[in-house]
């Protein structure tokens, strides 16, 4: 049995007031330049803040139709990497939305640089939520040794 996606992909799926998810295409892990035949699903979360800015958590591969759908929900303002693995497509989104703030989690800048990723981060996530989403989203850093991840609560 092959792997399957959470259809439909690249479509915003409302999960509650001002929050939804978008399932993306399969991704494949590459180690030492070798693409492994192990597909994994991708998903991003979109939160509309009280000022109508959008908080995009772990952006999936960019798709123009999805970007247009999200424009109808609000202004894409925050592109957030919750950990050093979920940043791969932030660069694609930031090229289309250059006014968006790109948020780096611990170790993501170093990992992106080592992998020659085409992404520039404008701010670093800190323990306390930034003023930009403090009224709508709380956050905490989950310390897992080498792997640290920000967890967000809406």
List the model feature ranges, each with a label:
Residues 1-50:
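Zn-dependent metallo-beta-lactamase
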Residues 16-21, 55, 134-138:
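Short, hydrophobic/aromatic-rich segments at coil-to-beta transitions
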Residues 42-44, 147-150:
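Short, surface-exposed beta-edge/turn micro-motifs
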Residues 47, 83, 152:
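Divalent metal-coordination and catalytic microenvironments
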Residues 49-52, 154:
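Short acidic-glycine loop/turn motifs at beta-strand connectors
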Residues 56, 61-104:
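Active-site metal-binding motif and surrounding structural segment of the metallo-beta-lactamase
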Residues 59, 91, 114-116, 148-153:
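A short secondary-structure junction signal
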Residues 106-149:
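Metallo-beta-lactamase
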């Amino acid at each position: 049995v092959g792997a399957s996606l959470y259809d439909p992909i690249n479509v915003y799926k409302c999960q509650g007031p001002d929050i939804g998810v978008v399932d993306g295409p399969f991704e494949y892990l590459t180690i030492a330049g070798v693409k492994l035949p192990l597909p994994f699903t991708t998903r991003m979360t979109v939160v509309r803040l009280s000022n109508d800015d959008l908080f995009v958590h772990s952006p999936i591969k960019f798709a123009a139709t999805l970007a247009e759908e999200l424009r109808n929900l609000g202004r894409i303002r925050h592109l957030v990497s919750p950990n050093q693995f979920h940043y791969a497509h932030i660069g694609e989104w930031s090229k289309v939305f250059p006014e968006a703030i790109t948020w780096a989690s611990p170790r993501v800048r170093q990992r992106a640089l080592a992998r020659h990723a085409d992404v520039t981060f404008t701010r670093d996530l800190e323990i306390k939520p930034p003023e930009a989403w403090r009224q709508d989203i709380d956050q905490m850093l989950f310390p897992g040794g080498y792997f640290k991840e920000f967890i967000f609560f809406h």
